């Protein structure tokens, strides 16, 4: 976990950046004069139906040449992954190459060897930053590495109500609950590759595992009594703002 104090800090948000497609958005983003950018997953499209990682290596090599130098060299970068940079479309914890994919992800984003992510499973992390005397804690989740199998067919997934089914896995859950309940931040921003509040579509979302979603929303509700809670999500190739009582979710994709 890192901590720092800054003034007038500005974040950009985004997800789903195919290395083989046009990226004409960057000049417009540069005009925003950002201090940091948060990549919310599918930061490359390197997955194959077989799950093998030969395309992933190529995808990262290409993306390294596509991402603007002013962004990668001058701005703070935070990143989580989703299925296409995890290595298997809609993949989860049973993906056999996930350890290799994790190493490729950490190397691409220049995560230091001293970072906790280098010494445990999963790419989840947290960062505390004091911005204009407001303490902001950013919590990045890994919704892939530990996730149970989806139920139903692709693009028509059903709710998996098995009490043993998980998105985050036991260790990440313990870390998340401890992080949130012991936080002294004014604002907590949760980064999740898949949507939390949206339920009215047949694609991947927290509601595919309703008990996990319930647990997360109860944790957020408990924390929101004293902390402003916000989530940022991706995946959907669209943008939106969702609200549940005092909890706001922003989808940027």
Write out the residue ranges for each language-model feature.
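Metal-dependent phosphoester/phosphodiester hydrolase catalytic core
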Residues: 1-253
């Amino acid at each position: 976990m890192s901590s720092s104090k800054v003034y007038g800090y500005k974040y950009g948000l985004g997800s789903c950046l195919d290395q083989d497609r046009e990226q004409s958005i960057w000049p417009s983003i540069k005009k925003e004069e950002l201090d940091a950018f948060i990549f919310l997953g599918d930061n490359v499209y390197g997955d194959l139906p077989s799950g093998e990682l030969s395309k992933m290596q190529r995808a990262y090599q290409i993306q390294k040449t596509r991402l603007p130098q002013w962004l990668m060299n001058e701005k703070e970068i935070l990143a989580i992954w989703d299925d296409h940079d995890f290595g298997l479309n809609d993949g989860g914890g049973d993906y056999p190459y996930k350890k290799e994919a994790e190493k490729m992800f950490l190397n691409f984003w220049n995560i230091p060897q001293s970072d906790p992510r280098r010494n445990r499973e999963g790419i989840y992390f947290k960062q505390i930053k004091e911005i204009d005397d407001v303490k902001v804690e950013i919590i990045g989740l890994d919704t892939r590495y530990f996730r149970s199998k989806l139920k139903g067919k692709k693009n028509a997934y059903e709710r998996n109500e098995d009490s043993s089914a998980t998105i985050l896995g036991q260790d990440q859950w313990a870390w998340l609950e401890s992080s949130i309940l012991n936080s002294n931040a004014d604002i907590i921003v949760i980064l999740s590759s898949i949507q939390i509040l949206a339920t009215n579509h047949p694609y991947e979302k927290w509601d595919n595992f309703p008990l996990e979603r319930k647990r997360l929303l109860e944790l957020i509700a408990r924390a929101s009594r004293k902390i402003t809670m916000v989530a940022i999500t991706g995946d959907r190739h669209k943008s939106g703002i969702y609200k549940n009582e005092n909890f706001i979710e922003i989808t940027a994709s």
